[in-house]
A protein has these predicted regions:
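Extracellular glycan-modifying ectodomains
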Residues: 2, 31-329
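Bacterial N-terminal signal peptides that target proteins for export
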Residues: 3-19
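Bacterial N-terminal signal peptides
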Residues: 17-28
Length: 329
């Protein structure tokens, strides 16, 4: 289900666990390491153990910011704007649900705000997603699924709304209104969260129980409308996949077509960006704005993080710079 697609086109429906399995197994290592891939908190809340609760890599973060800044400058020469979205880590939102023997390091708690400040200092256009997710938490709505790595569809849509507002404030999009995605009706589906289904033995998985996934039905759109040029393109991982609705909501809020390139998380943001920039789609129709999505917990990992990305997603820094220059001559 990776690759380029228009918001609003229906996609092959897979079980929640199948959608996320590639991301999780690759990030956590082999199946034999599955038991150590999950932190079991209070009230059945699960957290990914590959996102450290204690360590912060400031040097890696600074390097990633410099790489993103270089991409921004290369895109600017082509009159393409870049909006950077970094999804906050799950654990700081639910610190009270972490096990008592695995508390959050204060440095980890402060990291997201510091990252936002550093990106703005570097001149990057970014959206502070943390307050958006905090506002999402009310009543039965949560920012993240209880036993899942991912944010909820509510978080995805609220972030998409804020992203659309940012884009409309900064850029005058080409094309006529009326090309936005049509949103389907909400429905509930009970399923095991990916952290439970992929990493816990059956007896523990049963004890954790299923989560309720409130998501939208996919809506088939008029293909003539979908053929209109898209002024905005989204690049990211399974957080922006169609199942959770970010791109459809962004298209709906902008009232313009929005295209999407996404891969499972083990491919990494760097290779996914290159996949799009090297594609015939980009060569034939360049967007006005690229929205590039990262995750806080992996932001410090560069293109050369061979222990974290799959073989196709790893490249040396020198090769990365060469590839960017070739894709954006």
């Amino acid at each position: 289900m990776s690759g380029l697609m228009k918001a609003g086109l229906s996609s092959r429906r897979l079980p929640v666990s199948a959608l996320f399995a590639g991301l999780l197994l690759s990030l956590s290592g082999t199946a034999a390491q599955a038991a150590s891939a999950v932190i079991t908190g209070k009230d059945g809340w699960l957290f990914p153990a590959w996102e450290s609760l204690s360590k912060v890599d400031n040097a890696g973060t600074a390097r990633s910011i410099a790489l993103v800044k270089d991409v921004q400058q290369q895109l600017q020469r082509k009159q393409i704007a870049l909006v950077v979205l970094v999804v906050p880590m799950k654990a700081p939102f639910y610190a009270q649900r972490l096990p008592a023997d695995q508390p959050l390091n204060p440095a980890v708690v402060k990291r997201y705000d510091q990252l936002q400040g550093a990106m703005k200092t570097a001149g990057l256009t970014t959206l502070d997603i943390k307050p958006i997710l905090q506002q999402t938490e009310h009543g039965k709505q949560t920012a993240f699924y209880r036993a899942d790595y991912h944010w909820t569809a509510w978080s995805a849509e609220n972030t998409a709304d804020a992203t659309a507002k940012l884009i409309n404030e900064r850029y005058r999009l080409q094309g006529e209104p009326g090309g936005g995605a049509v949103l389907g009706d909400w429905f509930d589906k009970r399923a095991f969260g990916d952290l439970a289904s992929n990493f816990l033995p059956a007896i523990k998985r049963k004890a954790i129980g299923r989560d309720i996934y409130t998501v939208r039905h996919q809506v088939e759109k008029d293909l003539l409308i979908d053929d209109a040029p898209a002024p905005v393109h989204v690049i990211g991982n399974s957080f922006v996949q169609p199942y959770l609705g970010f791109t459809q909501k962004l298209s709906n809020a902008l009232d313009r077509p929005v295209t999407l390139t996404w891969n499972p998380g083990d491919v990494g943001p760097w290779a996914t960006l290159l996949q799009y920039l090297e594609s015939p789609d980009f060569a034939q129709q360049k967007p006005q704005v690229i929205v590039w999505q990262f995750n806080e917990g992996q932001f410090h990992l560069g293109p050369d993080a061979s222990a974290n990305w799959n073989a196709k997603g790893v490249t040396s820094l020198s090769q990365w710079h060469q590839s960017i220059k070739k894709a954006l001559p």
